[in-house]
Amino acid sequence: MRGLGGSTETALRLGSDAKDRVYRAWDGFIDFAARDNVLEVALGLIIAQAFTSVVNSFVSDIVLPLVSLLPFIMRNMDEKFAILSKGPHYQEGYNTIEQARDDGALVLAYGVFLEKIVNFLGISLTLYTLAQLYMVFSKRKIIKRTVKCKYCRKWISERALRCVNCSSWQDGREDVQ
């Protein structure tokens, strides 16, 4: 019959191994999560989400109501729609997208699409302006100019000596025979 000493040793060894594995896993997680680029990306995503909600609010609450005052629009952009296929009770007409959809009509909601395009343009123009201001004040280039490779016609950095796609020299060495 086995004594308790052998199983106690095994239990202690297994417990020690498990503790070491937990410590290694925790250290690996800390190494991953505390790296500079992971924290920068996480912070950037959080700021980008907040920035996007501000621009979306600006577009939908300030810009689009002003655009809706134009004589040929005369309604909020998100309420603009076209009927592609009428529903069974169309004789009264549809005042809203919800009425048309409830009646079974096929609706093209182009106003919502136009609103999303204006949101995209607002976000991209604002980000471009912020990048330009950052470059002016920090003297660092974050928007890098690109040119097309003379040989493969792919976009590469204007400062590249060789194309990353086809490995050709950009200073004309390929042309000399």
From Swiss-Prot:
Keywords, ordered alphabetically: Glycoprotein, Membrane, Transmembrane, Transmembrane helix
Biological role stated in the UniProt entry: Part of the gene cluster that mediates the biosynthesis of anditomin, a fungal meroterpenoid. The first step of the pathway is the synthesis of 3,5-dimethylorsellinic acid (DMOA) by the polyketide synthase andM. DMOA is then converted to the phthalide compound 5,7-dihydroxy-4,6-dimethylphthalide (DHDMP) by the cytochrome P450 monooxygenase andK, which is further prenylated by the prenyltransferase andD to yield farnesyl-DHDMP. Further epoxidation by the FAD-dependent monooxygenase andE leads to epoxyfarnesyl-DHDMP.
SUPFAM superfamilies registered for this protein in UniProt: Gated mechanosensitive channel
Topological category with respect to the lipid bilayer: Multi-pass membrane protein
Transmembrane segments: 54-74, 117-137
Pathway note: Secondary metabolite biosynthesis; terpenoid biosynthesis
Entry-linked PANTHER family: LARGE-CONDUCTANCE MECHANOSENSITIVE CHANNEL, MECHANOSENSITIVE CHANNEL MSCL
GO cellular component, one term: membrane
Gene3D superfamilies: Large-conductance mechanosensitive channel, MscL, domain 1
This protein's encoding gene: andL
Species this protein is from: Emericella variicolor
Designated name of the protein: Anditomin synthesis protein L
GO process terms (BP): terpenoid biosynthetic process
Gene Ontology terms, MF aspect: mechanosensitive monoatomic ion channel activity
InterPro entries: MSC/AndL, MscL_channel
Location (main, coarse): membrane
Glycosylation sites: N165
A Pfam family of this chain: MscL
Location(s) in or outside the cell: Membrane
